[in-house]
Amino acid sequence: MENSRIRITQITARSVFVPYEAPLGPYIGRRRVGRGPGTLGASALIVRIDSDAGITGWGEGTGELASDVAKRLTGVDACSIESVLALMREVGVAPGPASGVEMALWDLQGKAAGLPVCRLLGGRLRERAEFTACMGIKEPSESADTARVYHERWGFTSIKTKAGEDAELDLAIAEAIVREVGDRAQLRPDANSGYDAAVTP
């Protein structure tokens, strides 16, 4: 395959901070993520991979990518993604930044092949995919208000909430959301295996 001779010439990674627009907020529990008092947002790592073919791939991850790791990947076959992942595991790159590198490599490979990445990964399964709004654990009334805004302002028809800390609170949150949005949006509580057999019916 012609693309297999494409080599990485440079990897750059930059941390960015994206402030949340209310009512968006921290997804996991009640943690506050931000810069300065009252600023809520999300940090991300934007990865750019340049190649000797003049093609650039972009990816998004989390954490930091050490400059020595980026230098070590220079010259590696950009289309041998498994080899790059193995090399990153070997030198101890955390999953967050590694995912950004992998995403950028897939983007680069798709551009080189003139194909959407979904084709490289086996083909399109469906024409449309439902996008789910996610919220952390909030008080029931706040959860209901957030669900309403997600649905009315942004058109979400699927809403995911965190759960698992307190089954009674989780039930109260679910009931409040259902009262607020009814059957206009599907509720998807996610307890992350937080319930034991005694709590789960």
PLM feature spans:
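N-terminal amphipathic alpha-helix/helix-capping segment at the start of soluble metabolic enzymes
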Residues: 2-10, 14, 111, 115-126
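Structured beta-strand/loop patches that form or line metal/cofactor-binding pockets in enzymes
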Residues: 2-56, 68
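Metal- or metallocofactor-binding catalytic centers and their adjacent structured scaffolds
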Residues: 10-12, 48-113
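Glycine-rich, flexible loop/turn motifs
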Residues: 20, 69, 84, 116-117, ...
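Conserved active-site and cofactor/substrate-binding residues in soluble primary-metabolism enzymes
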Residues: 41-42, 64, 79, 83, ...
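Broad gene-expression machinery/nucleic-acid interaction feature
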Residues: 44-46, 100, 130, 158
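Metal-dependent enolase-superfamily TIM-barrel catalytic cores that perform enediolate-based chemistry
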Residues: 122-201
